[in-house]
Amino acid sequence: MENHLISQNNKNYIFETKLFHNFKKLKREGGLRTKRIFKKSSSSKPLITIITVVKNNSKTIKNCIKSVINQNYSNIEHVIIDGGSSDNTVSILKKYSNHIDYWISEKDNGLYDAMNKGLKLSQGEYIGILNSDDTYKKNSLNIILKYFKKFKNIDFVFGTVFKGRILSGFWPKKILWKLNIYSAHSVGFFIKKNSQKKIGFYDTKFKYCADRDLFYRMIVKAKMKGKATNKKELIGYFTEGGFSESLNFIGRLLEETRIRLKNKQNIILVIILFFVHLIYQLRKFFIK
């Protein structure tokens, strides 16, 4: 009965209030930054930003977060970009809000759009990428910093990771990079913030392999310098069957070809590499 007695102005006010309340609920965010707690670099303790992208991965995101919390190095900024999860992921992010510098949950335009959001939010001198189903070893960031301090002129470090077997993060062979053939894993990848600004962001036109495009632009075009960690200095554990592994290999192969053409590789070489990779993938598929 009371609802019928509300004036038109009051109805508008109630509607606008509910609309504003619902809008606030749509933007789910948390972390230390929302409490006005910001970390800074110092000469002895440079700030390292770790970017994690997640969507509906409540089974592994907790271990990912804990592997950052448990680092022996203390000056870390963890930024987590959630693509609007509908499972228990956001509840886990809320639980660890006092250990995460900033997290946000909202719809995005895919993995690399979310990665770019994280890069734009990063404040550290160095930036690392840690997928939501991957983890670091306890001493990983100390190892990475050791390389940046020892080799002052480098732009990036590729760390050794474990993915069923030990995989070296970087082959510093110019010919391999010009062919866009290399071993590079995001869990072991770290870059100076200033160097990242020079090469820009992931190209979101690529759904599957934008990291390959970025690495190619970084090393072959911008001629940035990097180092690989010693094979005995394991940085982290790269989960098999993650995002990149579960993608349609034909779609991924076609996209790799587009990246080669975009970066103006020799067209004959591009065709040869396409068929070499196609045969390799088909053999893997049928030999299973």
Show which residues each predicted segment covers:
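N-proximal low-complexity "stem/linker" segments adjacent to membrane-targeting elements
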Residues: M1-S67
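Short, acidic, metal-binding catalytic loop of nucleotide-sugar glycosyltransferases
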Residues: K66-N75
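A conserved acidic beta->alpha catalytic loop
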Residues: D82-S91, N131-D134
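Glycine-rich, basic loop-to-helix element that forms the pyrophosphate-binding segment
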Residues: S105-S122
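Short aromatic/hydrophobic "clamp" motif used to bind/position activated sugar donors
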Residues: I127
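Conserved donor NDP-sugar-binding/catalytic core segment of glycosyltransferases
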Residues: T135, N139-G169
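Catalytic core of nucleotide-sugar-dependent glycosyltransferases
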Residues: L234, S246-V270
